[in-house]
Amino acid sequence: MPLLVRFLGTAASRPTVERGVSAISLTREGETLLFDCGEGTQRQMMRYGVSFALSDVFFTHVHSDHLLGITGLLRTMALQGRTEPLRLWTPRSTAKTLRQCINIGGERTTFPVEICELEAGSSVKRGEDYRIDTFAVDHRGTASLGYAIVEEERRGRFNPDLARELGIPEGPLWGRIHRGEPIMLDDGRVIESSVLVGERRRGRRIVITGDTRPCDGTLAAAQDADLLIHESTFADEEGARAQETGHSTAREAAEIALKAGVRRLVLTHISARYSRDTRDLEQEARSVFPNTLIARDGTEIELALTEELADTPS
């Protein structure tokens, strides 16, 4: 059950020859979500093979380089004959701006579009096994959110060898005990689930910051994350500029990753001055947090489960 993250746009503020502006897709069990939708996102989706059958789009904030692609994306979906509803999630007090952007050109969509405002600290439940949590970031006073994609804990690993030793026939009884039910065998023995099933296992956690200064909100949300996607607009030599504009340097992002104990850091939102050559940013970040990658348009990150489930009974 891999989880696939695709970087559709990795530039800061404006597109360059090498990079489009902000957009990230996440695909899990056939469902695709989009985080931010900078101009030209629908073309990037075509280019990198991302399905247009999105269920939701999450905006970190509504600055133009994260927003202006939604008009074209909705138009493309309408031309493709979409009828399914689409939900757009956006920070508190930004729905009006988002609605105005959608209505540019005066064309109606062929499907319902629902706009939902979110507060920091809220949670969007996705079925029974994962959710999307919001957290506060610091982008020079702009209404902004970061998002944490959080899978619920999974059942512990089932021990098939011990089950056979105990004389439990393979089949429905294995599934019942793995779901936590005690079972009674024909000889009257009662076997508790804890005998055959290990401790519950953590789900995956992916954190997307959007535009931000280093902040406590990100640090808390990123604790033990499998993947932290942090903006990195500038190198350390432009630290004053980063502070002035509400952005982060590569070193600052790496320091957050180190403090939070994340497994992997991917940097995005790269200033045009580094668009072709990101070596300085990469070296700066890796000097603090070695497991760092600077994303390019088309970069894919696949996160497998920490343990294979092939031997798990149904």
From Swiss-Prot:
The keyword tRNA processing applies. Keywords: Endonuclease, Hydrolase, Metal-binding, Nuclease, tRNA processing, Zinc. It catalyses: Endonucleolytic cleavage of RNA, removing extra 3' nucleotides from tRNA precursor, generating 3' termini of tRNAs. A 3'-hydroxy group is left at the tRNA terminus and a 5'-phosphoryl group is left at the trailer molecule. It holds the Pfam family Lactamase_B_2. Its cofactor is Zn(2+). Signal peptide: none annotated. InterPro entries: Metallo-B-lactamas (IPR001279), RibonucZ/Hydroxyglut_hydro (IPR036866), RNase_Z/BN (IPR013471). Zn(2+) 2 binds at D65, H66, D211, H269. Its EC number is 3.1.26.11. Binds 2 Zn(2+) ions. The keyword Iron-sulfur does not apply. GO terms for molecular function: 3'-tRNA processing endoribonuclease activity; zinc ion binding. The active site is at D65 (proton acceptor). Zn(2+) 1 binds at H61, H63, H139, D211. Homodimer. PANTHER family: ZINC PHOSPHODIESTERASE ELAC PROTEIN 1. Belongs to the RNase Z family. Zinc phosphodiesterase, which displays some tRNA 3'-processing endonuclease activity. Probably involved in tRNA maturation, by removing a 3'-trailer from precursor tRNA. This is Ribonuclease Z.
